[in-house]
Amino acid sequence: EGSGFISKAIGGSHSKDHVIERYLDVARYLGAKVDSLDDVEFPMPDLSKETASVQHKLQEAGWQGGDYVVIVPGARWWTKEWPVEHYIELAKKLTADGTAVVLAGGPDDAVKGQKIAEGTASSLVIDLTGQTSLRELAALIKGCSFYISADTGPLHFAAALKKPLVAMYGPTKADRTGPYGSKNSTVLLSPAKCAGCLKKKCDNWHCMHDITPEMVY
C-alpha cells in the first residue's frame, strides 16, 4: 500500500520476509547499524498522561480495577475482521470466568463494539471503541493483562509492549505482518484452504469464520 509512489526501490536480503525486516534493509541502506534482528526493540513514548486519562475513562465506564483483556474487533480490510458473533461468544466465555473485557479501536469500530457489548450483556464488558486517541489506545493496551485481535494496527502496540496476545490471521500472512519479535504471542492461522490470499474482497469469508471462539479461548 503506497509502494507505487516510491521513486527508487531498494532491494535487500529480506525482500520476501516480514515487512519490518524489509524496513530494516532500507535502514541499512541508509547507513544505520543493524547487527542482529534479535536486538530489535520498539521503544514507546512516555504514556503517563494517557494512562491517567484511560484509567479515568475506564472508571467512568464502571471498571472496578484489576486485570482486563483488550479486544480490538476492527481491521483496515473487512476481510481481515473476525465475525462479531465470534467476539460475542468469546467475550461471554471470558466474562463467565470473571475477566473484564475492554473493547477498543477507532471510530469505525464503534458499531462493532456496541454490538459485542450488547450481545455479551455483561457489566464486565466496557466499550471504549472510538473513545480514545492513538496514544490513549497504546496506554490502554500497556495496562492490559492480555490482548486479542485480528491483523490490525493495535496488535503491533501489544507486540511492542511485550503483552501476551492472540492474533488471528485469515487473508493475510503472519510471516509478513505478524506480531514481530514477540515471545508472548499466539498466532492462529485460519485452516481454510484459501487463507493467505491477500484479498480485500471476498465472496465467502470462510477463512476468518473458520477460526472458532474455542480456538481463541
Predicted features along the sequence, with ranges:
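Catalytic machinery of carbohydrate-active enzymes
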Residues: 1-217
